[in-house]
A protein has these predicted regions:
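Residue-level preference for the first positions of well-ordered beta-strands
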Residues: 1-2, 59
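Short glycine-rich, Thr/Ser-proximal phosphate-binding strand/loop in the N-terminal lobe
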Residues: 2-43
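Short, well-ordered alpha-helices that flank and scaffold nucleotide-derived cofactor binding pockets
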Residues: 18, 45, 75, 79
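Short, low-complexity, polar/charged sequence segments that are solvent-exposed and flexible
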Residues: 23, 44-48, 80-82
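A short, N-terminal amphipathic alpha-helix
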Residues: 39-55
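Short beta-strand-loop/turn "lid" adjacent to the catalytic site in phosphate-handling enzymes
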Residues: 50-98
Length: 98
């Protein structure tokens, strides 16, 4: 499974995908005052509420338009899953021209 995060100016959209299918999703407000730990707790609660096992995740991917929150949310996801959270951007080697 993959944890996908889309961090926008107003909302953080979170989705869980298994074999190209959306398993579950939710939305919460983007809040620059929240810490990485607070975002980790939000993500943890979402996964627990949906009975998802952390060991089944291959990692996380984050897209963000808020530079000041990108690191916090990426750290929250990687700490929770104990796996890398890739951040989409011009430095990520994905085989596509951006």
């Amino acid at each position: 499974m993959l944890l996908l995060l889309d961090l926008g100016n107003t909302n953080l959209f979170v989705g869980v995908y298994r074999k190209r299918s959306l398993v579950c999703s939710f939305r919460t407000y983007s809040d620059k005052t929240k810490s990485s730990f607070e975002y980790q707790e939000i993500l943890s609660q979402f996964l627990k509420n949906n009975n998802l096992d952390l060991d089944q995740f291959e990692g996380a991917i984050l897209s963000s338009v808020i530079p000041s929150l990108t690191r916090k949310v990426a750290l929250a996801a990687s700490s929770l899953l104990n796996k890398e959270c890739k951040v989409l951007g011009n430095q990520l080697k994905c085989g596509l021209s951006i």
